[in-house]
Amino acid sequence: RVRKSPYYESTLKYGVTGFTVYNKMYLPTGFSDPSKEYESLINDVTFGDFAAERQIEVSGPDALKFVRYIQPRNLDKCDIGSCKYIILTDMDGGIINDACLLRLEEDKFWLSPGDGDVILWLQGIAINSGMDVAIHEPDVSPLQISGPKSGKLIQKLFKGEHDDLGYYKAMQTSLEDIPMVIARTGWSGEL
């Protein structure tokens, strides 16, 4: 079964030109001419429905121990509010998937993996790990804001409150009483 994001109707309203299926969800693939979208990405600001980048929450007293177990990266400097690019590996070091790891609280992490059933893999490991962790999909739907003017948009939306959010950092906040997590991870090199 393929799910629709909470933004699905809005993408139709604003002229989505196509969808692909990613993580068992519809992911918009474009709204106009691809070269115009590229120009917006490198010169202006873009805003996208990335709800298909489904988050996985790992929480509990052994959350850090569990996250260390599923990937080889040193997390000694993964403080609350840190984001890390990680590679999820099997017991022989083979790559399962990659993900962005966000540490939201002392014992709460979010993983944002690529396409695949990573949550089932993590739940399977947790069952027999002896670690005190809970693994589930939080009810969140990511949006992505990119481009060299994205910082100005965030500044305007949050009235300058998060101007100091560093690269590969995240924080829990709210906008007009809507709780959210904002993360600055970008891949387009605009900021």
Stretches found by the model and what they are:
Residues 1-89, 94:
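Acidic, proline/glycine-enriched N-terminal capping motif
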Residues 97-191:
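Acidic, low-complexity central loop/insert segments
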